[in-house]
Amino acid sequence: MPLDVQGFDDLMTDISGMADRLDVNGAGAGVARQILEDAARPIHQQMRSNASQDPRRRSGDLYNALKIGPVKRSQRCGKHITIGVHRKDWSHEDYYPAYVEYGHGGPAPAPAHPYIRPAYDTRADESYEIIREGLRDAINPHN
């Protein structure tokens, strides 16, 4: 029994057109970068809110170190963005943000005071919606 497939050329044309709309004038990287940066903002805001509400906050160094990193590209993950304290941007001798987030069991154990994971859990749906809308607008700007 032969199988007749129709519309495959139209599908390929549509997919190619979507890719072209994401890469307007070779600026597709800028479109993806902007979408990721927009999606990172709600989580970053919540993270800063969580860090500022910690009753043990002393210097404000952790709060001030929370940043949205640059959009990077990797073969395995595609484009990605990081939000948090980036070790290379930490200006103090002692790097302690991870110990605040996870706690530690050293000679004087300290409990965890998470600020990163709760921010993601609280605002992830909002960020995913920003990504969906951004891609939808980039692919089909007439809707």
Where are these regions (language model features)?
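Short, Lys/Arg-rich flexible segments
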Residues: 1-82, 88, 97-143
